């Protein structure tokens, strides 16, 4: 199955693999995302075609769909495009798509890479369900190789672009306690941004690439390889440099842009695994990759450059899978074929290459240039993905070898959490989501629980520890009990609680664990004893980004102060999550805990 090949870079339709940068949207997308998702006749008698696409290309596909004058057998076609993480879409299709949870049901699925269609096939087989994608090779609509993106001065210090670099260089810097000082630089510890391989293609492919590098060969990765102690040690030591994980590389790229805006582009992170196209997006000042926002932000002072791992890298091939499902009837199938023909046309492919994708046949455009931090002659060694059972085992093994986390859960129990949200209160929905989310923690994670409002009965402080830090295995029963017992009272002491949580966590930060606070709140600061956001922002900003406490606040409900939560998250090098629709809280908790 898998293997490797030397240049040229050609992936015409069959198997490929790469990254997905996931756009975070839990409250619904734009107007296109809310149209009818079921095939058949749409508005004005048109055939409606719903495409679910990985986010790095969803915005461009939306533009192409809008520009396309669809006509099949004399009838019009209305194409809508929804962005969804490849891993999340694969899980949803395997268990049975629920539009209330997963969004519009797709007729066509275009994940970032064919690895996800292989994993979907394995999942449906295990569940004794029909195959939704078939065994045939799927046509590609664009390609982009996985790269290790690094601030240009750091990469230059390692010998870029003349020296071949790769995972062995990452491993050397990760293992050496001197970090960058081991190569005569003053950048501090080596830190790596890498997404969760259960959700993100970049995370999956970076993990696969690490294992392939560990074998010392470019041949097929096998289950026997994954069992070798030396291979596991290599991968585990690379994971030691990770600052946190997550469902999207956009968290890292957005934080890096904000650091660059402050003149700190060399302080946030040493490297992040992304697709080649994302390096171009970042260097244009547009890390989201959305064509509609291009030019709205200046280019970075410190650009990124792409390192193409010398041990070989994997590709995204953006497969176009017309689902073999009862709702995809003949008119929809014809519409899907017509839209594919348009997307692969020279005019549409030019739009892809202008946005720094490579064509479906692997050819690059002018955007892939050294001036943009990209090397058109690379990658010299392209790896094909391993067999589906090996991919699944990579995900399983990562869960055992990933960097463990120390996470403080902080839940708002102010009186407004007792307000109704559908059939339940906001607090009841949040409690149910938090209880389900506990199963996402790894066996080596330590978790604690606080509640907060304004000073609670019997206390002079607005926060209260309910469960101290304890290994999740030993503490899960107590965590469940205390979460289930939460009840609403009081106001919202957001700043004081955030400040205290940071100080408590800061006393126990170690390089071998991800230290983080997950704080859920439905309001804004109402505590007169602490109203100083500016001081809080300065306190949260780390001097040492390798030894810092990261905040992942959740703005819950329509009245949450999301702008302030973004300030907190940016200061603490985390990410803020929008759950303004209380019904989205399950998805949001899943996304938040993907960081660990």
Model-found features: residue ranges?
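Extracellular/periplasmic juxtamembrane helices and adjacent flexible linkers that interface
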Residues: 2-30, 45, 321-411, 428
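Early extracytoplasmic/lumenal segment of secretory-pathway proteins
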Residues: 3-13, 20-135
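A conserved helix-loop-strand patch within extracytoplasmic ligand-binding domains
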Residues: 125-199
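Periplasmic-binding protein-like
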Residues: 134-148, 232-246, 294-327
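Ligand-binding pocket segment of bilobal, Venus flytrap-like solute-binding proteins
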Residues: 209-306
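VWA/integrin I-like adhesion module and closely mimicked acidic/polar interface patches used
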Residues: 292-301, 523-580, 584, 590-592
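Von Willebrand factor
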Residues: 403-471, 497-498, 516-521, 553-556, ...
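Short beta-strand-loop
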Residues: 420, 446-485, 504-511, 528-534, ...
């Amino acid at each position: 199955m898998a293997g490797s090949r030397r240049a040229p870079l050609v992936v015409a339709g069959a198997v490929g693999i790469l990254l997905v940068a996931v756009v975070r949207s839990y409250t619904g997308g734009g107007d296109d995302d809310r149209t009818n998702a079921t095939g058949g006749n749409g508005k004005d008698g048109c055939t409606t075609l719903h495409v679910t696409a990985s986010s790095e290309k969803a915005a461009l596909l939306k533009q192409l769909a809008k520009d396309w004058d669809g006509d099949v057998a004399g009838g019009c076609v209305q194409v809508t495009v929804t962005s969804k993480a490849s891993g999340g879409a694969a899980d949803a299709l395997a268990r049975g798509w629920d539009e209330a949870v997963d969004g519009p049901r797709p007729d066509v699925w275009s994940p970032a890479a064919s690895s996800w269609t292989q994993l979907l096939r394995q999942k449906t087989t295990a569940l004794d369900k029909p195959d939704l994608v078939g065994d045939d090779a799927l046509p590609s609509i664009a390609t982009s190789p996985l790269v290790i993106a690094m601030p240009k001065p750091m990469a230059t210090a390692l010998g870029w672009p003349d020296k071949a670099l790769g995972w062995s260089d990452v491993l050397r810097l990760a293992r050496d306690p001197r970090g960058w000082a081991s190569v005569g630089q003053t950048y501090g510890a080596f830190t790596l941004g890498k997404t969760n391989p259960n959700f993100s293609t970049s995370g999956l492919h970076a993990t696969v690439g690490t294992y392939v590098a560990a074998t010392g060969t470019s041949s097929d990765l096998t289950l026997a390889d994954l069992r070798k102690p030396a291979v596991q040690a290599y991968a585990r030591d690379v994971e030691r440099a990770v600052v946190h994980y997550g469902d999207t590389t956009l968290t890292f790229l957005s934080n890096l842009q904000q650091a660059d805006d402050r003149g700190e582009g060399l302080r946030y992170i040493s490297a992040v695994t992304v697709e080649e196209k994302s390096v171009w997006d970042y260097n244009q000042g547009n890390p989201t990759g959305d064509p509609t926002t291009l030019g709205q932000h200046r280019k970075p002072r410190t650009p990124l450059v792409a390192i193409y791992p010398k041990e070989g890298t994997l590709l995204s091939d953006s497969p176009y899978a017309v689902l073999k499902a009862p709702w995809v009837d003949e008119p929809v199938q014809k519409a899907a074929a017509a839209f594919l023909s348009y997307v692969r046309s020279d005019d549409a492919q030019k739009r892809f290459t202008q946005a720094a994708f490579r064509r479906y046949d692997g050819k690059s455009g002018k955007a892939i240039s050294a001036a943009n931090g990209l090397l058109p002659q690379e990658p010299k060694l392209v790896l094909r993905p391993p067999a589906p059972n090996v991919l699944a085992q990579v995900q399983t093994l990562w869960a055992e070898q990933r960097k463990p986390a120390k996470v403080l859960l902080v839940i708002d129990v102010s009186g407004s959490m007792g307000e109704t949200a559908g059939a339940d209160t906001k607090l009841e929905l949040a409690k149910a989501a938090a209880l389900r989310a506990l199963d996402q923690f790894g066996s080596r994670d330590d978790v604690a629980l606080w509640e907060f409002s304004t000073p609670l009965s019997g206390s002079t402080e607005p926060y209260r520890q309910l469960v101290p830090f304890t290994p999740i295995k030993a503490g899960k029963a107590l965590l469940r009990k205390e979460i289930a017992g939460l009840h609403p009272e009081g106001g919202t002491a957001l700043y004081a609680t955030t400040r205290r949580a940071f100080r408590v966590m800061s006393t126990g930060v170690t390089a071998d664990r991800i230290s983080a606070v997950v704080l859920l709140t439905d309001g804004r600061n109402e505590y007169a004893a602490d109203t100083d956001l500016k001081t809080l922002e300065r306190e949260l900003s780390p001097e040492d980004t390798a030894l810092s406490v990261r905040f992942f606040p959740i703005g819950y409900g329509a009245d949450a102060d999301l702008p302030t939560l973004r300030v907190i998250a940016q200061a603490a090098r985390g990410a803020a999550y929008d759950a303004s629709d209380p019904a989205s809280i399950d998805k949001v908790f899943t996304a938040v805990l993907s960081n660990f």
